[in-house]
């Protein structure tokens, strides 16, 4: 029922080590990407259109082919108008997905899921150790995030394929066909024993191909030999699948319109569902915030 939901399963073992660092830290320098489903491109575009009226905080070139960056302080009337537009956006989301969920999500954590989970855990610990009046307005109650539009042209979803080595290729493919496939459905390509075969997955509404395949592989590899790896690029996949006792599964890219419905209906996405951008395009740690 949360308005903000994780796109990947939180590994609870990762939280305590992060808490040790954050709980006594005076500042946070996180990178949490919060994706909004602004198909009308009205929310962040409002800031872009008005940045000429804002105070520029920084502008410089980034290292390691990272390009150029500039930042403005959103303040005053423009900030108030932006907050109003956020409220309008959330109402639009409630209307858009009312038939899918009684409590639709408004934002998806696209990156930094564990950073955000750690921030929440630290604040919950503060609440246990202090009276409410001392923590109600504590700086650590809030986390710094970067809001991005899922539908922005700069957001490119790229598929992450699967290769299984050290396995009986024929048996894996036959079991996959038996348990997950039919005459029609979402196409995937399988490479094994120097062959290429197109299969059709039986998916329920809003289910992703990667969800079906990953669930199958997790169960199959509990009982059968094989090691799974996650591969970018079709050419590399085919090369690896040409090995003896190997299977390559080429998955389709997830459409942007699939993200929110999939998380609302099936929960967190399988690991390595998609990739957003290349290494040189990733965000740099620039903004920070006091948390104590």
Task: List each language-model region with its residue ranges.
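Surface-exposed, charge/polar-rich loops and edge strands
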Residues: 1-292
């Amino acid at each position: 029922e949360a308005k903000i939901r994780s796109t990947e399963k939180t590994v609870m073992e990762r939280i305590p080590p992060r808490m040790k660092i954050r709980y006594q830290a005076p500042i946070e320098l996180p990178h949490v990407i919060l994706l909004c489903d602004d198909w009308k491109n009205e929310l962040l575009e409002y800031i872009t259109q008005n940045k000429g009226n804002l105070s520029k905080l920084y502008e410089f070139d980034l290292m390691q082919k990272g390009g150029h960056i500039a930042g403005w302080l959103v303040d005053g009337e423009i900030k108030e108008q932006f907050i109003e537009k956020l409220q309008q956006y959330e109402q639009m989301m409630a209307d858009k997905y009312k038939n899918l969920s009684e409590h639709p999500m408004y934002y998806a954590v696209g990156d930094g899921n564990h950073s955000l989970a750690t921030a929440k855990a630290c604040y919950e610990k503060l609440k246990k150790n202090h009276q409410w009046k001392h923590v109600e307005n504590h700086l650590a109650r809030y986390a710094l995030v970067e809001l991005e539009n899922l539908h922005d042209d700069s957001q490119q979803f790229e598929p992450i394929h699967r290769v299984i080595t050290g396995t009986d290729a024929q048996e894996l493919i036959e079991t996959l066909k038996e348990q997950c496939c039919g005459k029609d459905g979402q196409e995937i390509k399988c490479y094994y024993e120097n062959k290429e075969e197109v299969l059709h997955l039986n998916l329920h509404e809003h289910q992703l191909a990667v969800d079906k395949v990953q669930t199958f592989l997790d169960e199959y590899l509990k009982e059968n030999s094989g090691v799974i790896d996650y591969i970018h690029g079709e050419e590399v996949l085919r090369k690896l699948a040409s090995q003896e006792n190997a299977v390559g599964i080429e998955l389709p890219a997830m459409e942007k319109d699939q993200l929110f419905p999939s998380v609302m209906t099936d929960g967190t996405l399988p690991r390595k569902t998609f990739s957003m951008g290349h290494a040189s395009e990733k965000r740099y740690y620039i903004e920070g915030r006091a948390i104590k």
